Design a protein with these regions (language model features):
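Class I SAM-dependent methyltransferase SAM/SAH-binding core
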Residues: 47, 53-104
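Short glycine-dipeptide loop
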Residues: 141-147
Length: 255
């Protein structure tokens, strides 16, 4: 199977996992959802590329007065997203879902105030395809619109692993199906009509607590670390400190 076929098979198999469909770490997922929601205002037209089973898009439709479209290459994920929208939104039509991908976009989508990806680019096989995706996204933004690129950072993971090694923990390796974002490549990328506004390390406190402190405590007890450990919950109230979060938000603005 090709990389794309293997990737699709993986996400097809996870379509019915609810909040855990995109990641087993539900707390990390909620952090991502809050970070995205904070950048979206009422009245906006929003596109979620790689929407999975629609958790983030439906949440936006429930909590904001926005029109959101979600696309994903997994038919099973889209079916799950439509079911979730029907159960959560009833007769409301502020969220719609269709099969598609960054290299096979549905026709007639139009322009958007905000486009976001949530660990979608890392599922592409290399930086060349990731950069091409950013180019394509830039073309779908209205003037002044923003692309919220919520993706896994190689620099963030490296810094996190340095902390883990310093307390005797093994380094974390990225999942086999992913290509984490090279931060320097993003910083040096020129995209016509698009400007990199800022990078936000919004997960740093959480990953330090969960992957270093919690993991170290579990090791002392001879246990496997749990995503539900109480110490991980501190990140819900603490500000993001440092730059050891493996998920970052790159904020791009259309000129």
């Amino acid at each position: 199977m090709t990389h794309a076929e293997q990737n699709k098979a993986l996400w097809d198999s996870r379509a019915d996992l609810g909040m855990s469909a995109g990641t087993n770490d539900v707390r990390a997922k909620r952090l991502e959802m809050r970070a995205i929601s904070a950048k979206i205002e009422d009245g906006m037209r929003v596109l979620d590329i790689g929407c999975g089973n629609g958790i983030t898009a439906v949440d936006l439709a429930l909590t904001k007065r926005v029109d959101v479209i979600g696309i994903d290459h997994s038919e099973k994920m889209i079916a799950a997203a439509k079911t979730l929208a029907e159960k959560s939104l009833g007769c409301l039509t502020s969220a719609e879902f269709c099969v598609g991908s960054i290299d096979a976009l549905p026709k007639g989508l139009g322009l958007f105030d905000v486009i976001y990806t949530e660990r979608m680019l890392v599922n592409l096989p290399d930086w060349e395809e990731q950069a091409s995706a950013i180019y394509s996204i830039g073309k779908m933004l209205r003037s002044g619109g923003k692309y919220l690129m919520v993706e896994c950072s190689m620099d963030g993971l490296s810094a996190l692993n340095d902390c883990r090694e310093s307390v005797g923990l093994s380094r974390i390796t990225p999942p086999e199906h992913t290509t984490y974002i090279d931060d320097a490549s993003v910083d040096n990328l020129y995209v016509p009509g698009l400007r990199l506004e800022r990078t936000i390390d919004f997960t740093s406190s959480y990953y330090f607590l969960s992957r270093v402190v919690n993991a170290w405590q579990a090791k002392q007890l001879g246990q496997e670390p749990s995503y539900d450990a109480p110490v991980n919950g501190l990140a819900d109230t603490l500000p993001a400190i440092g730059s050891v979060g493996q998920v970052r938000m790159w904020v791009w603005q259309a000129r």
